[in-house]
Design a protein with these regions (language model features):
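Hydrophobic/aromatic beta-strand patches that form the interior of the parallel beta-sheet core
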Residues: 32, 102, 133, 155, ...
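Walker B catalytic acidic pair
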Residues: 222
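Structural signature of PLP-dependent enzymes
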Residues: 281-300, 306-335
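N-terminal "arm"/small-domain region of PLP-dependent enzymes with the aminotransferase-like
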Residues: 2-88, 290, 296
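Active-site PLP attachment segment
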Residues: 235-279
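Short catalytic/ligand-binding loop motif for oxyanion handling, primarily in non-cytosolic enzymes
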Residues: 40-44, 194-195, 227, 260-261
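Conserved core of the PLP fold type I
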Residues: 53, 58, 63-217, 225-239, ...
Length: 365
């Protein structure tokens, strides 16, 4: 057939995953993958906590569970428990019925749904610049999500200071102070990717003060609640603080890391509003029907089962604490090894943050 394909002029897209493929093809015996995103056990593979494994087996053999589609917003019990996990059971937003949640296809799906909601309905009755501010650096996929959603201006606020190996607080505050009114600001409550450097509670108070003064809208990510500090409350403190101040908030949650459900794409989007909740909820439902119709059930059932049972919840929390402690011990061992080898450079930042990520400052050479 001589006819040309209608896709003949399609260029190759750049992909951050190409580095992983190159790594797999590299035959060097001493290669090291510094771009891993999963929590790995001692044998170098992802794993489940014993509790999660047990519950997955129970669900798989439960004769009362039948294959059926979930509601558009997912499993109601999962959404209720995920909301309480992020905001706390005594949250004023929950008590005042000012919040709704949507089970999503991973945290990526939560960010995409939130971006679609904001792009379509945020400040729809006023002149809006269409600006979203991301941290510099941040995961490249976040910028692509907002661009593909149609945001006119994807901008960045300064976050990482290579000289101090920590958060560049002065630059961050300056950039937010000068952001256009009603800009959306994407922030990490904990587990900042890719630096691992999180804001302290006092720093969060300053950021929240600027957002209130400048009419900025917080879109907050919680990628691994409980796995950064070992405390569910501490890792979600930023979201709870913003809600306590009366700010409207979108919050994207992931249950991949803290439950080990990497291949099951269990995410959740929280919407905390001051008013007009039912109308926004109806628009979210319409968007979900065009994005994935309804989410999968298995991983969400695991999460709902753990969070709704006090004994399971306590056991899961203990497992998270052990994982967080192990992450810190690995950091300390690496830091000590580099010190003993007299490796050039400053490695103190390895032991500063918690969680899975760390910015070690290596360049391409």
């Amino acid at each position: 057939m001589s006819a040309r394909s209608v896709f003949v002029d399609t260029p190759f897209a750049s992909s951050p995953m190409k580095f992983i493929e190159d790594y797999k093809l590299d035959a060097h015996p001493n290669k090291v993958n510094l771009a891993g995103r999963e929590y790995l056990a001692e044998h170098g593979q992802t794993t489940w906590l014993p509790l999660i494994r047990k519950i997955k087996q129970q669900i798989a053999t439960d004769p009362t569970l039948i294959p059926e589609y979930t509601p558009v917003f997912g499993i109601p019990e999962f959404s209720r428990r995920a909301t309480e996990l992020a905001l706390g059971t005594d949250s004023p937003a929950i008590l005042q019925s000012r919040v709704f949640g949507v089970q999503t296809v991973g945290c990526t799906g939560a960010v995409r749904l939130g971006a679609e909601l904001l792009r379509t309905w945020f400040c729809s009755g006023s002149s809006w610049s269409g600006s979203v501010f991301l941290s510099s650096p941040c995961d490249e996929s976040l910028a692509e999500i907002f661009k593909s959603t149609g945001f006119e201006h994807v901008r960045y606020y300064r976050y990482w200071d290579a000289k101090s190996s920590g958060v560049f607080m002065d630059g961050l505050l300056h950039d937010l102070e000068n952001a256009p009114d009603h800009s959306v600001v994407l922030l990490f409550a904990s587990g900042h990717s890719p630096t691992g450097a999180d804001l302290s509670q006092e720093e969060w108070k300053r950021v929240a003060e600027v957002m209130m003064k400048r009419n900025l809208f917080p879109f907050i990510l919680i990628p691994a609640q409980g796995l950064c500090s070992g405390s569910l409350e501490q890792d979600a403190w930023a979201v709870r603080h913003c809600v306590s101040l009366g700010l409207e908030v979108l919050c994207a949650q992931s249950f991949s890391h803290n439950f080990g459900l990497y291949g099951e794409r269990v995410g959740h989007l929280l919407c905390v509003l001051r008013q007009n909740l039912l109308a926004v909820q109806s628009q979210a439902e319409r968007l979900v029907q065009t994005l994935w119709s309804c989410p999968s059930v298995d991983g969400a059932r695991v999460v709902a089962t753990v969070l709704s049972n006090p004994a399971h919840l306590a056991e899961w929390q203990e497992g998270l604490k052990a994982m967080a402690v192990r992450c810190m011990l690995i950091r300390e061992r690496l830091h000590e090894r580099l010190r003993l080898l007299a490796s050039p450079g400053c490695w103190g930042n390895i032991i500063k943050p918690g969680g899975l990520y760390c910015c070690i400052g290596l360049n391409g050479d």
